[in-house]
């Protein structure tokens, strides 16, 4: 089973990934493959992602991590994929591993909340200004991440909750998915919004 976590920058994907690892689930980060390729070519990561998709198609990054995903699936039977950016990548995984084997979990937070989180987080590629933040969102949306979010089987809203509360929401969703028990979540896996 593949659990694909998607969301705009600062929504909380990283925390979901941490919880998944705590639950013993291996994680494949698509951005790591892009970073490796960028380093190999001596390019900026954002430019590398764009170039890969131009050179090899919109599902290029999914194809780059396919071996890692297969290895982790053989080892653990489940893997979290962090970093799907467009519908073509999602469809690649669904075609390769089976429609019913892929669960999409979207993490949602408002733009204002995400901007504040990114400013506090302070990673090298995080925006310093509202304008930089908006440009980054536009770039992400341009890749097609909004289309992937709209196809989510599960949506976790990460607004007005403490970090421990959000992490518990993530844990609840992960455990329900692993049990294959949508009844553990209100509304099942069909575009679920985990209650605030």
UniProtKB/Swiss-Prot annotation:
Record InterPro entries: NTP_hydrolase-rel, P-loop_NTPase
Signal sequence bounds: none
GO molecular function: ATP binding
Keyword Isomerase: no
Record: residues binding ATP: 7-14
Pfam families: AAA_17 (PF13207)
SUPFAM superfamilies assigned to the protein according to its UniProt record, in alphabetical order: P-loop containing nucleoside triphosphate hydrolases
Keyword annotations from UniProtKB, A to Z: ATP-binding, Nucleotide-binding
HAMAP family hit by this protein: UPF0200 (MF_01111)
PANTHER family per record: DEPHOSPHO-COA KINASE (PTHR41930:SF1), UPF0200 PROTEIN MJ1399 (PTHR41930)
Family note: Belongs to the UPF0200 family.
Name of the protein this chain belongs to: UPF0200 protein MK0400
């Amino acid at each position: 089973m593949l659990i694909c976590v998607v969301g705009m920058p600062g929504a909380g994907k990283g925390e979901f990934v941490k919880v998944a690892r705590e639950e013993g689930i291996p994680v494949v980060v698509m951005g790591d493959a892009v970073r490796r390729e960028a380093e190999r070519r001596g390019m900026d990561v954002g430019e590398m992602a764009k170039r890969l998709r131009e050179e090899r198609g919109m599902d290029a990054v999914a194809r780059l991590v396919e071996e890692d995903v297969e290895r982790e699936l053989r080892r653990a039977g489940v893997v979290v994929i962090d970093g799907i950016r467009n519908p073509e990548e999602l469809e690649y995984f669904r075609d390769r591993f089976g429609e019913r084997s892929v669960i999409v979990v979207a993490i949602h937070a408002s733009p204002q909340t995400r901007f504040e989180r990114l400013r506090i987080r302070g990673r090298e590629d995080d925006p310093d200004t509202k304008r930089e933040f908006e440009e980054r969102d536009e770039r992400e949306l341009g890749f097609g991440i909004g289309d992937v979010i709209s196809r989510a089987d599960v949506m976790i809203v990460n607004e007005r909750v403490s970090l421990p509360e959000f992490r518990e929401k993530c844990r609840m969703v992960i455990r329900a998915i692993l049990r294959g028990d949508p009844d553990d979540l209100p509304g099942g896996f069909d575009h679920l919004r985990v209650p605030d």
